[in-house]
Amino acid sequence: KSSAASDVYKRQMSDEPEDVKEITSICQGLNINIGTLNKRTIEGMFAAGARANELGHVTLLDPVGAGASGLRTNTAVELMEKVRFDVIRGNISEVKTLAQGSGTTKGVDADVADAVTEENLEEGIAFAKAFAKKAGCIVAITGAIDLVSDGATCYIIRNGRPEMGKITGTGCQLSGMMTAFLAANPEQKLEAAAAAVCTMGLAGEIGWGYMQKGDGNATYRNRIIDAIYLSLIHISEPTRH
């Protein structure tokens, strides 16, 4: 239901504690992104999460930079304890931090030592399944090779371009889009999460195809956004999963 997702993906953004409950009530899905943390935004995240759970809305946690600081790690872990999430979406370092309670993340990017590769793929799959079972929700680990698991099944997705890692915000964009896909397909959450990852990867490939000599990563970012906007035209493009 990609067309339904496009209708859902009309977002409202708020981090003010007095505002988030009302905004959450009129939205079909909640994406909690911890990219900007302070006392006020943290309070707003917990309030929004509680309201979304009350209403039975789909919820997603994007633990941006978890492992880079104690505040980020502790906030993400506490959110997992107090809010019922349908999906946790992050890079491998962020997700490992949630699983272990500490990490080696030096920012919002995954540590090279943690990367999922063809050589350690089986280990990565086992980790994704185990953490999904422990967390009680779908886990989407994104990187050069993407893993999406509900604890029983694990989708392995190889779409995308290495240059996507040089653009700040592609992961956050994916989390927003994934929330919309889940809100449009609440009975097929695992498939919706995997479809969002495939769509983002395809957008990266399609966008790269329009790059010209002299274009840089700012242009590429906009090409990706354009490709997502035009995704219904390219919906028949093959995915590798």
Stretches found by the model and what they are:
Residues 52-81, 87:
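Glycine/small-residue-rich loop that forms an oxyanion/phosphate-binding "nest" at active or ligand-binding sites
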